[in-house]
Amino acid sequence: MKASDVRDMTPDQLQDELLKLKKTQFNLRFQGASGQLEKVHQMRQVRRDIARIKTIQRQRSAETASKS
């Protein structure tokens, strides 16, 4: 997921995507712990996607706070 794609999302879409990614991260952690995870790079991708979404959310909240 690219940052430009994340910036185009609405706040509700961002929240939904964040919840979906957190569930995915949870499942990947269990797969990794039990030795069933074949694509180890997915954990890194999901973690970075979560960080991108949280960064965009934080930037938007900072923008609205500075406008007030």
Curated annotation (Swiss-Prot):
* Alphabetized UniProt keyword annotations: Ribonucleoprotein, Ribosomal protein
Q: What is this protein called?
A: Large ribosomal subunit protein uL29
This entry's Gene Ontology molecular function terms read: structural constituent of ribosome
Task: Say if the entry is tagged with keyword Ribonucleoprotein.
Answer: yes
Q: Which family does it belong to?
A: Belongs to the universal ribosomal protein uL29 family.
* Taxonomy, superkingdom: Bacteria
PANTHER family under this entry?
60S RIBOSOMAL PROTEIN L35/50S RIBOSOMAL PROTEIN L29, LARGE RIBOSOMAL SUBUNIT PROTEIN UL29C
- Per its UniProt record, what Gene3D superfamilies does this chain match? 1.10.287.310
Q: InterPro entries attached here?
A: Ribosomal_protein_uL29 (IPR050063), Ribosomal_uL29 (IPR001854), Ribosomal_uL29_sf (IPR036049)
**What gene is it encoded by?**
rpmC
One Gene Ontology cellular component term attached to this UniProt record is: cytosolic large ribosomal subunit
BP-aspect Gene Ontology terms: translation
